[in-house]
Every structure is written in C-alpha cells, then in structure tokens.
Amino acid sequence: MAETTPKVKGHVVILPYPVQGHLNPMVQFAKRLVSKNVKVTIATTTYTASSITTPSLSVEPISDGFDFIPIGIPGFSVDTYSESFKLNGSETLTLLIEKFKSTDSPIDCLIYDSFLPWGLEVARSMELSAASFFTNNLTVCSVLRKFSNGDFPLPADPNSAPFRIRGLPSLSYDELPSFVGRHWLTHPEHGRVLLNQFPNHENADWLFVNGFEGLEETQDCENGESDAMKATLIGPMIPSAYLDDRMEDDKDYGASLLKPISKECMEWLETKQAQSVAFVSFGSFGILFEKQLAEVAIALQESDLNFLWVIKEAHIAKLPEGFVESTKDRALLVSWCNQLEVLAHESIGCFLTHCGWNSTLEGLSLGVPMVGVPQWSDQMNDAKFVEEVWKVGYRAKEEAGEVIVKSEELVRCLKGVMEGESSVKIRESSKKWKDLAVKAMSEGGSSDRSINEFIESLGK
C-alpha cells in the first residue's frame, strides 16, 4: 500500500533579522517546524536569501531598501537601516502574504524576529496570528524590558547597582547588557534596536525564547510572582544531530553568510589528543578590541595549549610579532569554521568565547567547558551565568580600572577548565547541562511540547 503524505498542519512565514546570529536559530526553528509537517516560508532580504540552502525550506526575498548590500559595511547606520527595512520590508512582506492568500496554503502565522517589531503590525493588518522570536536569553530579555518600560532609568547608573528583577539573579552594572550601560553613549543606535523590541511585544500571540526548561530557573519569590518576561521556551535551536537526532541529516544550520573552512579543521583536530585543544572564537562579527586581541594571543602563547583560533585575516597582521611562528606546531588559525562540528570533536577541551548567546548555547548543549571574554551587548550577562549559575567555566575578569582582560587572567581561566580538580567539577556540570538540553528537544521534552502546542494553535 502506498504511503500517504502527512497532512500539512499549517503555513508559517518566518522573518529573521538578516545577520548570522539571528539567522541560525530562526532557520533552525523553521526546520524543526517542517519536521513536524508545518509548511514554512522564510521571508528575508535579497542579500541574505541565497545564504539559506536548506532544501526543505521555501525562501522568498523581500526588500530592506538596500537589497544587494550587506549589513555592517563601512559607514553603515543602524538607524537608517532600521527605518528602511521597516518601510520597504512592511510593503514587500505584505505583498508576499497576499500572494499566498489565493493558493491552497494561505499563511496562518508570522514569526518575526523581535528586532523587527513592525512584523506584528503586518501580521495584524493581514489578520494573522503572530509570534515574536527573541534571540537573547530570558534574563537579558527581562532586563531590557525593564529599561524599555522605564522601570530602570537610561542609561544605567553604576551607582544604582545591583539591578534586581524579582525571580532572577541580581546584576551588577558590568553584568547588564552593555548597550543600556557602558556602551549606551558610544552606540546609542544599538541600544534603540534592543529597546524597541518591547513596546508592542505583549500584543503578540506568542513570545518565543531560545532557551530550555531549567536553564534560567527563577528563584523563589517571597513577594509575589516572578517579574521575568512571560515567554515560551523552544530551544536550544541547534541542529538535531547534536541533540535528539530525530531530524534526518540535520548537521548544520543551513544558512551561512560566511564560508567555513571545514576539512582543514577536522584533519588538524584528528591529530590531537582528546580534550587537549582550546577552541577560540569570538563570533561572526569577530569583534575584539586591538589591545584585547594582543592579550588573547599572549595568553595562548604562554599557555602551551593546542588551539584552533577563528580569526579574521585582517586581524592576523595585528597579532604580536613572532606569535604565528612560535605557535605554529600547536595552532591552527582559520577565518571561519563550522563551529558545531568543531565543538563536537573529542579533541576539544574548552571553548574560549565572547559568550554570544548562540555560542553559549552551543557550548552548553555539547557539554564543552567555557572561558568567557565578553565584549559587549548581552555577552556580559551570559558570561556571568557560565561561571556563577551553570558552573561550566569561568568569566575572565577585567583588570581593575581597565576595560581589558590581561593575559595572566586568561591563562588562569584556561588552565582552570583544562587541568586539575576544578576542571573535573566543571566537566561534571557541563555534562549535566548537555543532558538537559538533549532532554528538552527530545520527544516529549519541555521544548518539544511547547513547539507542539504552538503547531496545534495554527489556524484556530
């Protein structure tokens, strides 16, 4: 008897903010929905559309007003881009939704990146349900919401610390998202993007956060209900091969704006002993201030550890004189790599990271101990949780009175996660969180149930 095609349970449009750190979790969520028989169309900018290569996903280009120009080029203005994307994106997204109205698969729901709150306006104008997808963790979202609502004054005042939200750990000034604190005056446009996520967020039908049950367990509240943002946890949104393995051949995100160097990395790692390599990566933007870049290099040089460093070619020329030559027998420098593939390799002993949320979730989900060197945005908060809440590594501390982590501190942290009794305890904690991540995404797990509940709501 011929197999029947499973009934499609609805049609969803996903609207991501077009940078790598937002594409990854939202495209992964799209694939997860498709695996559960939901039709998904990704609406993304003309420049970004060709980077999404997953066969099971339909990709439709919409205009941000720049079309063939990437975000982040010299002279790029976040404010100008935001206005242009709102104007052009709203119009072209509406036309896309209209196009499907007359087909046998009209749109049921728009899942929009929280950085694009105008997505809710489009959804409502087209009489669709709407879900806002947050790519930060729940704590960061809750803190930013307080600033957006005026509960905490802007910019954050160091003398007002600690910053408390009922049900969440208190935060020092340096643990706040930096764009409402130390970087508010120098990067106000980034702060505005973060705060603009919240004025209309409670009007959405769903608020999705890329986290999982137990990860940010709120503390007991003596004085009433937790003040954390009410959201549905649907993560970790990383490829299934590294979690529940229920999605066939799901080994990467299927969306890359950069070309990874995979074969060379894997061949090099195969020559190293188990848990002997420090993997060093500071994200798709690769942001390290020049003085910090030098301190990282000195630490790697003095640590005597094997290391694989993802570093832009332009930054290699800024490394201390003699660094490349003196470390060539135990180092591999590449411009980009498949980070999950590297983290999953048995030779990796720790992850020296900026603690962007995607990278932090990947480290947790694969059970890799971490050393956090946060630079800006939400990274300070994530690094705090790495050390104090999850106990899976260390946050490298800045030198007193300076915005820089010295090489001596980095060596201390690297040795702490790679050697001795401290490394044993950290590895035990890392395994615990890895197991919880797998459980959340497995059949009947907390995140799996939440995704199923969303699917059941489609068309109702």
Swiss-Prot record:
<feature type="binding site">
    <location>
        <position position="379"/>
    </location>
    <ligand>
        <name>UDP-alpha-D-glucose</name>
    </ligand>
</feature>
<feature type="active site" description="Proton acceptor">
    <location>
        <position position="22"/>
    </location>
</feature>
<feature type="binding site">
    <location>
        <position position="22"/>
    </location>
    <ligand>
        <name>an anthocyanidin</name>
    </ligand>
</feature>
<dbReference type="GO" id="GO:0042742">
    <property type="term" value="P:defense response to bacterium"/>
</dbReference>
<dbReference type="GO" id="GO:0005634">
    <property type="term" value="C:nucleus"/>
</dbReference>
<dbReference type="InterPro" id="IPR002213">
    <property type="entry name" value="UDP_glucos_trans"/>
</dbReference>
<keyword id="KW-0328">Glycosyltransferase</keyword>
<comment type="function">
    <text>Involved in the biosynthesis of glucosinolate. In in vitro assay, may use phenylacetothiohydroximate (PATH), but not phenylacetic acid (PAA), indole-3-acetic acid (IAA) or salicylic acid (SA) as substrate. Specific for the thiohydroximate functional group and does not glucosylate the carboxylate group or a hydroxyl group.</text>
</comment>
<dbReference type="InterPro" id="IPR035595">
    <property type="entry name" value="UDP_glycos_trans_CS"/>
</dbReference>
<feature type="binding site">
    <location>
        <position position="354"/>
    </location>
    <ligand>
        <name>UDP-alpha-D-glucose</name>
    </ligand>
</feature>
<protein>
    <recommendedName>
        <fullName>UDP-glycosyltransferase 74B1</fullName>
        <ecNumber>2.4.1.195</ecNumber>
    </recommendedName>
</protein>
<dbReference type="GO" id="GO:0019761">
    <property type="term" value="P:glucosinolate biosynthetic process"/>
</dbReference>
<dbReference type="GO" id="GO:0052544">
    <property type="term" value="P:defense response by callose deposition in cell wall"/>
</dbReference>
<feature type="binding site">
    <location>
        <position position="362"/>
    </location>
    <ligand>
        <name>UDP-alpha-D-glucose</name>
    </ligand>
</feature>
<comment type="similarity">
    <text>Belongs to the UDP-glycosyltransferase family.</text>
</comment>
<feature type="active site" description="Charge relay">
    <location>
        <position position="113"/>
    </location>
</feature>
<feature type="binding site">
    <location>
        <position position="359"/>
    </location>
    <ligand>
        <name>UDP-alpha-D-glucose</name>
    </ligand>
</feature>
<feature type="binding site">
    <location>
        <position position="135"/>
    </location>
    <ligand>
        <name>UDP-alpha-D-glucose</name>
    </ligand>
</feature>
<feature type="binding site">
    <location>
        <position position="339"/>
    </location>
    <ligand>
        <name>UDP-alpha-D-glucose</name>
    </ligand>
</feature>
<dbReference type="GO" id="GO:0047251">
    <property type="term" value="F:thiohydroximate beta-D-glucosyltransferase activity"/>
</dbReference>
<dbReference type="GO" id="GO:0005829">
    <property type="term" value="C:cytosol"/>
</dbReference>
<dbReference type="Pfam" id="PF00201">
    <property type="entry name" value="UDPGT"/>
</dbReference>
<feature type="binding site">
    <location>
        <position position="357"/>
    </location>
    <ligand>
        <name>UDP-alpha-D-glucose</name>
    </ligand>
</feature>
<keyword id="KW-0808">Transferase</keyword>
<feature type="binding site">
    <location>
        <position position="378"/>
    </location>
    <ligand>
        <name>UDP-alpha-D-glucose</name>
    </ligand>
</feature>
<feature type="binding site">
    <location>
        <position position="358"/>
    </location>
    <ligand>
        <name>UDP-alpha-D-glucose</name>
    </ligand>
</feature>
